[in-house]
């Protein structure tokens, strides 16, 4: 990940989107949560616009690195202020709530194991203030369930509900 550039991100997104369109897909979503070397969600949104694919981009994030009890390496994390500020910027720049719009943006902390409880709550408040969707990965393995029970004394579903991460504007992977 340390060598990925904005151009590489744009080209790889363009190729993937072209393959999707060739198979008949007209709408896709992507959960981008790594931003090395100046990469931004804009790089994938630009690819979707160039290709002509309807795109639901989600501004992912990881703020809780290994040194603080999270799963991702510290080098892949961002400050929570930067995450929330960039999520607002991307929503304001690109989100189109109109029916049949070509670009929508959601807020998507990577998982409860890679961000703080504070960021999960703030991300939900931010998304709802803009009327955009919320996305995260939740209970993908028995290890995820064990982590949630050990760290939060709750199942992943109970934890998500306690943080306001349930409802018609939320989708979990």
Show the residue positions of the predicted features.
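Divalent metal-binding segments
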Residues: 1-41, 109-119
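Metal-coordinating catalytic core of metallo-dependent amide/deamination hydrolases
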Residues: 39-173
